[in-house]
């Protein structure tokens, strides 16, 4: 994941879903080959906007397009939200995120870079042992926009294999770097057995921001069925880890981390249960043909 502005568009009366053609316009013709289920686009990041043709069906269920899913959020009125972290594992950030989650009792999905998982296998195992879920965030966080099918598949396959080797479990989810979901990525994800996980709410304030601003944003805009996209790493492997971009991203991550305990506490005070992506989707959105 790359930092993107979170949408604060009010929830529509029903959840928006993509028709076959609408998904093809947004993600490419690979969806016809691989199939997928898309749902929950009533609130979404600008980076993940797609051309919508259909409004939600009254029941708010997913639309069946095959055996694989593309998820932004889940249409529900139940106070359940998926918490996700990208770009790790990181020896400075990941343990502190795990501590905050343990204190709050929240569960999360960690979308890891294979490059980082191979270098910090103990952290991958710690995430699994703490009861959290693993996702595949590619091998080196390469932006997949404009990449060939073979380049794309290599990024997904190497990431998956390194994460599975370190954690001992196969990651269910694939989250594309920067939210750039291409036709080749949809194909590769389906071939590797992944569902695709995007996000509907990001950390909020532009720039580095402050812990108070991030916590205030999250506690204000998060609602039932959202997928929150945060970070426990900086995308290392794609740029100079000591360069200005890395320093800027680490400063942002430290602000997110400082905001996390307050944000979790406020969300739980609203009665919101924070769970993994699989817990959210499997409990609330059965596949419908």
Where are these regions (language model features)?
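Catalytic grooves of carbohydrate-active enzymes
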Residues: 223-278
